[in-house]
Amino acid sequence: MRALMNVWEPHEVSAELLAMQNIELQQQVVEKGIVAIEGEGGQLWKGDITRLKVDAIVNAANAQGLGCWAPLHNCIDNCIHSAAGIQLRKECNDQLQGRLLKTGEAIMTKGYNLPAKHVIHTVGPIIDTNIPTKEQEGQLAQCYRSCLNLAEQAGLESIAFCCISTGVFHFPNERAAEIAIETVRNYPRQSVKTIIFNVFLDKDYDIYHRFLSEGSPAAATDC
């Protein structure tokens, strides 16, 4: 089913088909297990972001904003769309109407079959060399601000960030973590109380853990 979802064109489908899909995806939620993060401030969690029960998870999207079209690809964009259901691509398409997302921009959708209430989709910079430019560093910081702007406008209280741009977009992991933590720390939050830095790789966990617990110049223990 997932492979078919990944190549599905965003158009209306029958209620019966949606119901069948939703039953299957909700069963997958039960099998994977739902993770609820307690407490406020900045927190680090390693695991599958599609398990998190928060107000919003952040998706590292591409400029088209419609998810990954490669069947069964393991990028976070594909994983989130596959777990949410075909409704997610439809809503993204309805919002964008063929327009491309700018680097640093974000849009927010419902979470559908995810434990998260919403998905915030943002496009990070693509790095062609090992060293990002100052402009690209600024674009990555803008991704985090754009996501927080949408969360604040909607009155959300919790948000989980993936490691934006560090996957197939090749942003250096350590510098990306510094920018993420610094941007979140300096953002004037009001409604958002809990920010989760979600990582999937051991090396990202080690980087974030070090910055958050050992006093990196760009980090705060409590974001």
Q: Positions of the model-derived regions?
A:
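Macrodomain-like recognition of ADP-ribose-binding/processing modules
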Residues: M1-C223
